[in-house]
């Protein structure tokens, strides 16, 4: 009901069903009828008006569901990406994909009754352990340009249904009603897909989880093998139906081959292990030949992968660069090594599953529906070292048996084969070791470092504390510039403040206020007051399609010319509003006593309860207003539907979009793209339309940006999570290392980004430019300037905390520290350095750089709290 209240519609759109367990006389237990297969069959009947199912409806009127045409099936741990459901429905509803049945109505002969999308592994799941990262494969790959080939779909126009997809309800019921006998089918997906004809749609993706440890993966594999071998009856001409009658098998030869091929794959580990042992003991020709052949079987996936990678990356091969291949080869090598170590247990596992199934099929006829969810299996298992040895003892027995056989038949080879035998004997330990949960490394900061960062954050916050006042309508002035002899003229900026502001400035100020509260610089009351006053001013400013303009006068609230809407600025402000809303929501979760203390309400006062109620209501209203402003920003205004890219901005006065685009993934506009997709303003495919050109930086890959600035790479990281093992994660590390390397090359501190530099206009204001690191940006002439921005180093705290602290200390020793944290930049460019000096200090601070610095420090000291807040928003 809460979901229906949150997403109101003309009719109920959220329903909750559960099935009552029934006593199964064959299995001798209370269970849902026919497990998942029965759940789908009964649910289909329920949608068509049946009242004799075991479903219990908890909420909702079922009459509106009787016209349901398609059902999408998901597991609990399956994620359905945005627009995937719409695309699945559109594909299955296409006239050319409509199911056509044979004369008997027992099989779909043209079109499709079910579609199976591509299933990828979630990045977070693949990073849970070394085992998962090795066997989960590549994650986070774009399904649009990388739609994979499926041999069955390519050759026979039908694929394999794996249980996560979309099916036609009427086709399902017509073909499968009464088809399968009870208490016999565990792996129903392949069988159902073979009857109603499954189509593979590999350009549509679902995201699934992967077991974190080996024992859970082994248990899942055991269950799959049992399910596959229980389909033996459907290899023959006359299987039984639900009525217990033998009927003609409608499955095609290729469908039966799919069943047989699954069974064949389960025989590979036992066959390889048997070949290894036989080759080391009794087979002619020497153990080396058979060992090499067995290893070749295990290495076949690596060989196929490498040849395919070489084919698709022939351009890189022609340049002589093979470094891009090494990470993939390393993973494939680890896969082969673990496969060798675990082959005894894998062989035992397969044989055990096969023998159990054959025994139950032919003798006991029970426990054929023995099944446990992967999540329950993971929770039940003992995953300490003792648990691994207790579970994997058959592997040790097989290893000991193989050793004994070698001693008896070929003792002279024992010395040469001992490394392999020792690996087998250590297999429980190896499985336990690679299954250890990956833990987040503690930030490499000492207590002294943390105190130094707190001090830096406090002085940086002082810029906003001093200058965001009623005189500027609680808007942050764009920058502060220290007066020098050159600026003490009548033309100097009044009070050294630039009384103008932008959406990015405002967003960074508001999140800086939240960070200041996190770090105990201000009280909760002060924070709420600041947010309320700034939001009040913002809501009174002119906007365009929900977007704030690029520049306003903070003292008069006048719109500054030229009137312009910036894509990046709108994305930054929207992202800051989302984080701010989640930060305020945290206060509503506090108990009354804690909230009263945070608000400094007098203890025991008679009206404390009323004040608390009012403050909670104030927080709720602030949250609603913030999200309303986000939803009002129409990002379609700035989007090119044909190119699927964002323009740099919109020139309001001439009603013209800029000719240039944000076409690189390594860009500060990544946050705007993410939010626009989350809002539904633009399609998901835009995310994959941005360019991902790579450059080699040392032994790592990095995405190319336009200017090679730290700002482009690391600004989105202030609120967006980083996932280990991804291309972005590798890019962050490579970029910081390259910046550090470049600093060493030119003999300067590192940290290059867009910033002010030591050149002034007629009003003696510092000029501003994007400075980058050669090798990271496409822009030419990046090596011509030598400008170091301290805020760039503070941003790098998220990637290399220890290295950033050392560089901050170096910058401070050079005079970069001031009352508002650190100066804007140090300019080492020779033609801009005063005579007799080694560098010029750009004696200014900029509001958005101040905000980025505070957020970066807050994240490093508060365990990425801003990122967690941003990703907590359901939208």
Model-identified regions with their sequence ranges:
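Internal catalytic domains of large membrane-associated glycosyltransferases
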Residues: 1-244
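Membrane-proximal soluble regions of multi-pass membrane proteins
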Residues: 22, 143-151, 181, 205, ...
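Loop-to-transmembrane boundary segments
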Residues: 35, 243-271, 326-346, 361, ...
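Long hydrophobic segments that form regular secondary structure
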Residues: 166-169, 187-197, 211, 247-248, ...
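Flexible, glycine/threonine-enriched loop-and-boundary segments that flank and lead into catalytic domains
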Residues: 2, 25-28, 46-72, 100-101, ...
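Carboxylate/His-rich catalytic cores and anion/metal-binding grooves
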Residues: 1, 123-124, 205-227, 231, ...
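Membrane-embedded multi-pass helical conduit in multi-pass membrane proteins
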Residues: 264-365, 393-441
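Ser/Thr/Asn(+Pro)-rich, low-complexity disordered segments
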Residues: 385-393, 411, 415-419, 423, ...
């Amino acid at each position: 009901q809460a979901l229906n209240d949150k997403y109101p519609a003309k009719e109920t759109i959220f329903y909750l069903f559960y099935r009552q367990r029934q006593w199964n006389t064959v299995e001798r237990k209370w269970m849902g009828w026919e497990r998942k297969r029965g759940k789908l069959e009964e649910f289909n009947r329920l949608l068509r008006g049946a009242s004799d199912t075991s479903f219990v409806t908890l909420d909702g009127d079922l009459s509106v569901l009787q016209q349901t045409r398609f059902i999408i099936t998901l597991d609990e741990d399956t994620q359905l990406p945005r627009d995937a459901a719409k695309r699945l429905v559109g594909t299955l509803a296409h006239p050319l994909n409509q199911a056509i049945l044979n004369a008997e109505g027992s099989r779909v002969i043209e079109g499709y009754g079910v579609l199976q999308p591509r299933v990828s592994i979630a990045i977070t799941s693949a990073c849970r352990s070394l085992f998962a990262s090795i066997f989960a494969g590549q994650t986070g790959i774009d399904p649009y340009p990388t739609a994979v080939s499926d041999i069955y779909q390519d050759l026979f126009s039908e694929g394999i249904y794996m249980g996560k997809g979309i099916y036609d309800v009427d086709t399902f019921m017509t073909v499968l009603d009464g088809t399968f006998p009870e208490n016999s089918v565990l792996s129903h997906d392949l069988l159902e897909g073979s009857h109603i004809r499954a189509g593979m749609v590999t350009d549509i993706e679902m995201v699934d989880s992967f077991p974190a440890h080996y024992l859970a993966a082994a248990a899942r594999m055991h269950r799959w093998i049992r399910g596959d071998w229980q389909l033996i009856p459907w290899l023959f001409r006359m299987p039984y139906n639900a009525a217990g009658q033998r009927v003609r098998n409608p499955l095609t030869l290729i469908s039966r081959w799919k069943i047989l091929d699954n069974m064949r794959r389960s025989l590979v580990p036992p066959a390889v292990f048997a070949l290894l042992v036989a080759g080391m003991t009794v087979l002619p020709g020497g153990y080396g030949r058979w060992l090499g052949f067995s290893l070749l079987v295990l290495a076949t996936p690596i060989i196929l992968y490498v040849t395919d990678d070489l084919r698709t990356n022939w351009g890189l091969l022609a340049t002589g660069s093979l470094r891009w291949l090494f990470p993939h080869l390393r993973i494939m090598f680890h896969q082969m090594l673990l496969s060798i170590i675990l082959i005894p247990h894998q062989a035992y596992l397969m044989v055990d599953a096969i023998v159990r199934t054959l025994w139950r099929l032919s003798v006991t006829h029970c426990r054929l529906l023995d099944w446990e969810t992967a999540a329950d299996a993971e929770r039940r298992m003992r995953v300490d070292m003792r648990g691994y040895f207790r579970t994997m003892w058959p592997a040790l027995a097989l290893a000991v048996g193989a050793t004994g056989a070698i001693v008896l038949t070929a003792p002279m080879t024992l010395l040469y084969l001992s490394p392999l035998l020792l690996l087998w004997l250590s297999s429980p330990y190896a499985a336990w070791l690679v299954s250890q949960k990956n833990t987040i490394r503690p930030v490499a900061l000492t207590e002294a470092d943390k105190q130094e960062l707190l001090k830096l954050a406090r002085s940086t916050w002082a810029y906003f504390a001093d200058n965001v006042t009623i005189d500027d309508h609680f808007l942050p002035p764009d920058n502060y510039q220290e007066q020098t002899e050159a600026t003490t003229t009548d033309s100097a900026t009044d009070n050294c403040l630039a009384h103008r502001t932008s959406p990015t400035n405002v967003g960074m100020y508001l999140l800086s206020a939240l960070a200041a509260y996190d770090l105990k610089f201000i009280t909760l009351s002060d924070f709420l007051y600041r947010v309320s006053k700034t939001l009040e001013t913002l809501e009174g400013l002119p906007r365009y399609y929900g977007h704030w303009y690029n520049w306003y006068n903070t003292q008069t609230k006048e719109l500054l010319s030229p009137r312009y809407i910036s894509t990046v600025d709108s994305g930054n402000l929207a992202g800051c509003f989302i984080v701010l809303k989640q930060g305020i929501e945290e206060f509503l979760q506090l108990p009354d006593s804690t909230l009263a203390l945070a608000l400094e309400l007098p203890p025991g006062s008679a009206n404390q309860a009323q004040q608390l109620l009012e403050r909670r209501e104030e927080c709720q209203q602030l949250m609603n207003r913030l999200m309303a402003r986000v939803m009002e920003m129409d990002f379609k205004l700035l989007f090119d539907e044909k190119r699927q890219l964002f323009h740099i901005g919109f020139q309001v006065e001439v009603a013209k979009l800029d000719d240039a685009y944000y076409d690189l993934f390594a860009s500060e506009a990544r946050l705007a793209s993410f939010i626009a997709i989350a809002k539904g303003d633009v399609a998901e495919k835009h995310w994959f339309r941005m360019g991902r050109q790579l450059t080699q930086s040392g032994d790592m890959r990095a995405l190319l940006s336009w200017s090679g600035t730290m700002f482009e790479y690391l600004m989105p990281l202030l609120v967006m999570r980083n996932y280990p093992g991804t291309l972005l994660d590798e890019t962050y590390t490579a970029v910081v290392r390259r910046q550090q390397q470049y600093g060493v090359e030119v003999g300067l501190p590192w940290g290059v980004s867009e910033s002010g530099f030591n050149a002034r206009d007629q009003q003696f204001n510092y000029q501003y430019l994007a400075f980058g690191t050669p090798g990271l940006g496409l822009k030419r002439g990046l090596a011509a300037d030598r400008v170091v921005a301290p805020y760039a180093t503070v941003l790098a705290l998220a990637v290399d905390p220890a290295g950033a602290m050392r560089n901050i200390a170096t910058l401070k020793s050079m005079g970069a520290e001031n009352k508002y944290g650190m100066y804007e930049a140090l300019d080492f460019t020779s033609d801009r350095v005063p005579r007799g000096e080694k560098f010029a200090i750009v004696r200014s601070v900029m509001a958005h750089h101040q905000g980025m610095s505070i957020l970066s420090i807050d994240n490093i000291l508060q365990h990425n709290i801003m990122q967690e807040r941003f990703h907590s928003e359901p939208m």
